């Protein structure tokens, strides 16, 4: 049986904030080639891997503020307005101040970290503070306790299972978006949605992804380990 341990987010990755180059200086943005992500970009983003946002910044824009260039596979987590948008950097990106992103260390699978943060969204949001709107500080993010398997291969198996479910969801969404508004096609789309397993239905005891589940105890165990 895989060993799970409780640890802080800072034990499994490096927490990094972001910033906004001055919009009063056109040179910070015009013809920029560096992807710069804001929470607004993630509000309309439904995938897992993000390449760029609505705007890019330039090298001078990057140097002008405290935003940092984050490497591919960094997990972006919005820490304000709102808390809880999650995506994985598909390439080098930087963000505004609305993120506390996590660069996974060598013992942490990036996709597992993505799902771990998604599962702990409510917990993290509950630790936010502020009067006008809630915000999660860098120090708070670093010290949030999560439960993770020590074996990276176990992390990879878990993320692969959950990734298979998301792959199916995304495939069905693409199909549904291409269907005409004929009543028959509406019924097809409804049937496809019913075939997508809920997260708590995804495991059998043999660890395989299930279309409909069938082992409630294993699923509950799995969910509780992720959200611990």
Please name every model-derived segment:
Residues 6-16, 23-61, 194-228:
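DNA target-recognition patches
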Residues 50-52, 65, 172:
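Short glycine/proline-centered loop/turn elements that form peptide/ligand docking sites
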Residues 30-33, 66, 82, 89, ...:
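A generic structural signal for well-ordered coil/turn residues at beta-strand boundaries
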Residues 29, 50, 57, 86, ...:
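Short clusters of hydrophobic/aromatic residues that line enzyme substrate/ligand-binding pockets
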Residues 2, 79, 93-100, 130-159:
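A short glycine-rich beta-alpha junction/loop motif
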Residues 18, 38-40, 54-118, 128, ...:
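A short beta-sheet element
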Residues 121, 125-128, 169, 183:
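Structural signal for hydrophobic packing residues in well-ordered secondary-structure cores
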Residues 1-20, 143, 147-210, 218-219:
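Non-catalytic DNA-recognition/assembly elements of restriction-modification systems
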